[in-house]
């Protein structure tokens, strides 16, 4: 009987790590700042996933405590997140900064005020090179309502649609 209990406990203990983190999800919100009119991009990711990706990229352990951490993070985000205007021209986002707690990291970018983002193309490949199951959701909040783009390794870009839904 003791052997059966021991084996059952052993199985539970050995499967816990596999259950700990089985999904890979990132969230970006695009919205206008009501005070400045600037278009704000707020990216939220699991800190451990970002550290893992940047460690893999650099070939050494990445930590936000390192002197060059913000520069490395900025380069990685800039290389993997982009927007193109309706004319297909890549638009440079201004780096605002980042903050993190023990679980999450938030990265902030912005654009000067825009008439709208209708027809703009958004590309987000953050963490795709590290986790094949990564899903990046982009929420757009503006005068056209709230909507989302779902990006995966197979679908890395999408277009911001601004058609208001009719309530007929």
Residue ranges, per PLM feature:
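Positively charged n-region of N-terminal signal peptides that target proteins for export
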Residues: 1-5
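Bacterial N-terminal signal peptides
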Residues: 7-17
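N-terminal soluble domains immediately following signal/targeting peptides that reside
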Residues: 21-168
């Amino acid at each position: 009987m003791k052997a059966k209990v021991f084996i059952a406990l052993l199985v539970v203990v050995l499967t816990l790590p596999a259950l700990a983190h089985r999904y890979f999800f990132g969230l970006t919100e695009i919205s206008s700042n009501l005070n400045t009119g600037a278009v704000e991009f707020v990216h939220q990711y699991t800190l451990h996933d970002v550290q893992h990706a940047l460690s893999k990229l650099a070939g050494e352990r990445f930590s936000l405590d390192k002197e060059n951490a913000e520069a490395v993070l900025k380069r990685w985000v800039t290389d993997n997140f982009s927007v193109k205007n309706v004319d297909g021209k890549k638009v440079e986002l201004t780096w605002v900064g980042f903050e993190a707690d023990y679980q999450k990291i938030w990265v902030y970018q912005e654009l000067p005020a825009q008439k709208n983002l209708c027809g703009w193309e958004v590309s987000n490949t953050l963490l795709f090179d590290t986790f094949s199951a990564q899903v990046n959701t982009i929420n757009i909040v503006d005068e056209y309502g709230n909507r989302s783009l779902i990006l995966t390794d197979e679908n890395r870009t999408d277009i911001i649609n601004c058609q208001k839904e009719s309530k007929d």
